Amino acid sequence: MCKITENIPNGARNPAYLPEDFDRPMVFIAEAGDIVGTRIGVKTDWYCLCLDADAHHFNKEHPIFHGPFEVNISVELKPTPSEAFRFVRTDGQPLPDSLEMWRVQTKGYKTEEGFRPGMIARPWGFADSPDAEYISGGVSAKDIDAVAMGRHGNFFFWGFSASPENMTDEAQTVFANAVAYISKFAGQTPIARRYKSDIATREYAVQQKDFISYKRWQERMVVEKQYIEKTEEIKKVALAKQAKGEKLTSEE
């Protein structure tokens, strides 16, 4: 794939892989949504490279869960990701203690050391234009509304990182359905583009107001303290192992 480079206002050269009039259907896997998409205004930007193995808040009525290949989605009630409670919801609704989840991958980076994490996109803008769809969220370190699967124009975003061999059988089928689904958008392009990921939207403003509150500062200090304590523990173990001439792990 070749790069198209153009001058941008700050004098740097920003690489692009596709022209803005590209109208062929395409599926973005994980961070490819950001690397390839955002340069041409696709809303699949890099919110966090922290998507794990489960999906939640998925639209069960969406076509990718119904065909062309038949699939029966297995759901399980699991605890709401703890990180999600750090974010205020723009609809003002409290988060439940547990969520209905669907297993997409057989492995995830949280339980499998060295496994590649997926990427989630910012949710703002997936519901305010006819060319975009929110399809599913996923377990991550960000808010509950972050996008793990979605569509913008002729681009389908599959934020999960696993190759087919590490997908569940159900996910393999849904992925095939997603490829078939996005093919219907051949000849179309995004209508409302977003070139700046943190552009001030109503949702972003609400979230930022919450972030600067004293309550959130206190919570952040607790997290920072826990991180420092964990780091010191790892350091202590690593130094002891090093003194004995033992091999250190990648984390150490």
Task: Identify what each model region corresponds to.
Residues M1-T38, R216, R220-V222, Q226, ...:
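Helical hinge/lid and interdomain linker segments adjacent to catalytic or ligand-binding clefts
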Residues K3-P9, A32-V36, E70-V71, S140-K142, ...:
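Solvent-exposed loop/turn segments at secondary-structure junctions
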Residues N7-I8, E112-F115, I135-G138:
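A short linear-motif detector with a strong N-terminal bias
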Residues I8-P15, E61-V71, S82, M167-T168, ...:
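Short, structured coil/loop segments at alpha-helix boundaries
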Residues A12-P15, I120-R122, D143-I144:
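A generic local structural motif
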Residues P19-F22, H57-F58, A127-D128, M149-R151:
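Extracellular/periplasmic catalytic domains that process cell-envelope and extracellular macromolecules
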Residues F28-S129:
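An acidic, glycine-rich "communication" segment
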Residues D128-E252:
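Extracellular ligand-binding/catalytic regions of CAZymes and related secreted enzymes
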